[in-house]
Amino acid sequence: IPQPLPAGYVQFKELLNTVPLPSHSMFNITNCHYCTNANNIKNCYLVRGASYTEDSAYLIWDQSSKQCLDSHMTNRCELSYGNVNTTTCYRTFFSVDCESCHEIVLCKDSVGCNNCFGSVGLRNKSYYIFNKSYTKEEYQKKVEDFNLGSNQSFQEIKEQAYKHWLDYPNKFIHGYHNTDVSGDYIYNSKNTKNSFRVNGVEDSKFIQNILT
């Protein structure tokens, strides 16, 4: 049975519904358009929830990336496109949950990798395609044969990569250094329930996008 909200919460709700909200929250921005909830960004377009981002567009929740497009939850990435939850990656494309990688395409849950394509769960690997190892020359020839300059060819190989991803289990949770938590993308937190994309949080429930 739902419990009534404490009086303090009711008062806060009334106040929140009465006081006008700002149209956007930004400071120290240079040459940016249609951005919000951002600080210390430069030459950006349609970027939301960003800090120290430069020369980028269509990002949500980014920190300290440069020349990135169409990505979500990126941190210190450069010259990358179409990614979700990537950290310190360079020339990374259409990849998810990757860290410290460069020159990878359509990879998932990979760390410390370079020149990999369509692979999942790799650690410190080079020249892998769909989780199979190749020589440098074989890798370059096979990727060239994919004809990624053609949108039709790329869409076909992307569908193949997504099906390959399904052959590997998803992580129960993305995070580390946690105690008694539930949700996803939780780091350095304790006693935190049903929360998402948080760092350094304790004794909390139902929160998101809190990075201390």
Q: Which stretches of residues belong to each language-model region?
A:
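Long, distal/terminal scaffolding or interaction modules
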Residues: 1-212
